[in-house]
Amino acid sequence: MTETTEAAARQLRETTVLTHLEAENQHDIAATLATFKSGAARTELPGEVADGYEAVADAYRELFIAFPDMRFDVNPGSLCHHDDRVIVETRVLGTHLGPYRGLPSTGRSVELPLVAIFQFDGADLVCERAYFDRIALLIQLGVGRDPNTTAGRIATLLNHPMAVARAALRSRRVPRS
């Protein structure tokens, strides 16, 4: 690929990613899906994969119901190109006002750093992978505990007594220097 062609492809991919993120910020599922290659749509979040238009639409629908004010704080300068991918470092913000993964509304606000990797087939978007700290999300929603805090240690003890007991036994066997 010539430098001019490569620059044009990069610009097209960047425009597609920004259009995609703006559609997500508008909670416009049809416009979000329209950024994917015809017949191909896939999103991957920690622990789950949505493959195909209907599954992807359902994943977005659940997010937009759970976090009706969800938005990505995108700085266009945070986009990075690598081969057939565009990588975006952003923050996602929102208020948990609807059910999410079986968790009823907590009314809590969340603000998480997120990295999204958009994979392309030529100029066509085929997959979006998002990476974020699920523990941080659960802590911000009020249902998780930082295991390094007193509350976190108590929660771990109460929720996982056998694991704590085994760890305590193992620690007694380790010779101390």
How should these model regions be labeled?
Residues 1-177:
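C-terminal and inter-domain tail/linker signature
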